[in-house]
Structure formats: structure tokens, C-alpha cells
Amino acid sequence: MDFAPRLREAVARRARTLPLLTSLVARYRRSQYERRIDGFLKKQDGEAGRLPSGVVYEATMRCNLHCEFCYVGTLLNIEGEWREELPLEVLKRAFPDEAGLQVSLTGGEIFMRKDILGVMEVFREKGYTCGYLTTNGTIINDERAEALADLAAKGFLKHISVSIDGPNELHDKARGVKGTFERTAAGLRRLQQAAAKRHAPLRVSVNTTVAHETLDALHEMVGVAEELGVDAIGLNHLMYSTPAEVAETVRLLGAADASVISTFVTNDPGLNPARVRTQVNRLVARCRERGIRFDMRPKVKEPILDAYYTPGSALTGRCLYPFLYARVSFSGKAYFCPFIRIEVGDLTKQSLEEVWTGETYVSLRRRLVENGIFPVCRRCCKVELAPGTADALVTVPAEEPLAAGAQ
């Protein structure tokens, strides 16, 4: 009998119960991270090494739900676009054989892609690890649950983030489809049972968003997590920009028009900062009481919460996402970041190294450093906002802590 998966699972679970160990590991990772990016920021030339730390692959832009606050809503379910999804043979050629590279999968709803398990197998065979995948969980059937558990047992799949917005009926309303919560719960049960059977060290978290429709029930997410057998909650603060911030970003980028910006654009997000503060604090307190791990993105700490939820308020900080992660669409086209959809290359025509070191990518990174952050970056899940406390900077702003970013 192979005891390795069982041992890995036991060690991982034990480590998560030791706050001091967790803190020390996080601080070590932070110091490593700071050392790496220090060179990028000091040089200010926009270069970021030969290859990224990881790739975020938007496996599909098809989705089976209709979420009210989805920041990529305008990119979803475009007629016929699914035909551009890279076939597995093309996918093999498009991505480099680079053992140790991290890939993360998002969408859209990735399980709308029928060959998604084949996609993951391609990456596993290349020696990659999957840092996380995001899903709404509604179409995780027995076959997929077993396959995901097997990929976790083999050490490929590390973390699954399941998007949930509140208790049963509230979640259904936010997602725009009746019965969504029950289908998600059923998918999670299948996944957990399959992982337990294989003793697979698979982390599962629920991911929720600060939104007007669900704010009053935010603290109830702890009960939802316990009902679903999940011990971690990731919170995304609402991601949005004002029309003026979009226009200024377009000017700074020298873009032709605002079509390159993909975010929720509004002059009024409909959220009172005092209410947000109260509800987030209730959620954090309840997580502590119940032993539920908690993380949020971006790190909107007390000194900046009012400004964050006041449209037009200037926020400062930094974003290192384009220095660390390549954002690759289902068609192989690479974009500067999730919000700024300027094409920087195409993996069906260039190598990842050629894209990553290409002049378009380098020039945009250089412009980002010169500006600190662009106006549309101020309320993005990838940004590191200032001011922040030392505790706020413990978690490395890697592509996936617990909060996975809105799908």
C-alpha cells in the first residue's frame, strides 16, 4: 500500500493547525518574494527574467451561470468563441516543457470545457503543478471528482476554490440560476469523498465577494462553509473602477479605446463603507471563533477601507502580477493582466519565453512601474495597497492564497 499520499495529507493538516509554523513559513515566503521583486523595481526597465513564476490559463470563457457582479461578464459566452479553445495537441506545443512551472486554471467555468481533464493531464505530463483552479462547482460529476482527487494524490493539483455567495436562496439569486447552491454542494461532496478515499492532500476553500446583494449575509458564510465541510474562506472585496479611472488608464496606456479594460465600471458600487466594515469584521470574528481559516484580496485594511469603497478616491500601492504571472487565454493569446486586456503575444506563434521577454510586455511593465499602479488597478484583487500593516504583508501576493479572484 502506498502511504505517501496519506502521509502528505496528515502533514498538511497538522501544519495548518500550528499558527506559529504557518506564520514562519509565510514570513519566509514573503522575504523570498521581496528579494525577487526588489530587482524588478530597482531596475525599472520592465524586464522580469526569462520565464514567469507561473501561468494563469483561462481554459474557457464559457459559463453556465449569470452572476450579477462578474467582472469578466462581457467576455463570457461570446457566440462561437469556444471554437478557438486550443485542442490538446496544440496546447502541448504552445506551452513549454518546463518542470516545476506553476499553472492555475480559471475561466469562465472551466468544467464547461469538455476536455478540461485532458488539459490538466497535458500540464501534469509537462511537470507542472496546478496551484489552484476556480469553479462554481455545479458540474463536478463523479468522473470529474475522481479525476481531480487522483490529480491531487499525484501531487499535481493543490487547491480548488469554489465560488459561493451566501446561503442557499441568496446564492441562487446572486448566480442567476435556481438550484445552483444545491448543485454546488453536491459537487463538493463528490469531490471531498473522492479525495478522502485517496487520502489526497487537496485544499478546498469557498470564495465569496463583497457585494450589495449579499453583504448583510456575509457573516453567514461560516455556517455555509461548515455545512459544506470546508475549513477555509476567501473573501474578495468588490472589484470596480469609475468611468474616469478607465479613461485615465486608457490615456496612460496609449490605448485606442476602453475596450481593453475588463472590470465592473460604475460611479456607485452601492456599498456603504461603514456597513462593509461591520460585516467584514463580523465574518472575521466568526471565522476565528469557529476555527475557519480566512484570507481576503486585496488586503483592504482599516485605514483605507473608506477610500476603497468611495468611488474616485485615490489609492496607492503596487502591482507585481505582470512581473510574476503570464495570463494566457483559451486561444493561446497572452494578455497583460486580467483587467488590462492588451495582447502581449500568442503562444501558438511564439514561445512563452519570447512572449514574456517581448517588447510589448516589457514596455507595459515599465509603464506600470513608472505609474505605481494604473487607476483601474486600485480595486483589483491582484494589487498590494498602501498603507498596510506588517501583518497585512505576511501572505505572499501569489496568484492564489485563499481568495481566488472573481471568475
Features from the language model and the residues they span:
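Conserved alpha-helical substructure of the radical SAM core
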Residues: P5-K158, Q407
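Flexible mid-to-C-terminal extensions adjoining Fe-S/redox cofactors in radical SAM and related proteins
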Residues: L7-A10, I37-L51, A307-P322, R327, ...
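A C-terminal junction/extension of Radical SAM enzymes
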Residues: A48, K197-R203, P243-F336, C380-L385, ...
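Soluble or luminal CAZymes and related metallo-dependent hydrolases
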Residues: L51, R83-V90, G179-R183, E213-A217, ...
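Amphipathic alpha-helical recognition patches that constitute DNA-binding helices
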Residues: G54, E58, S205, G234, ...
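A structural signal for short, well-ordered beta-strand segments
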Residues: V55, A59, I160, V206-T208, ...
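Short, solvent-exposed loop/turn segments at secondary-structure junctions
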Residues: R62-N64, I110, I139, P167, ...
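Radical SAM/AdoMet-radical enzyme domain recognition
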Residues: L88-T106, R113-H237, A244
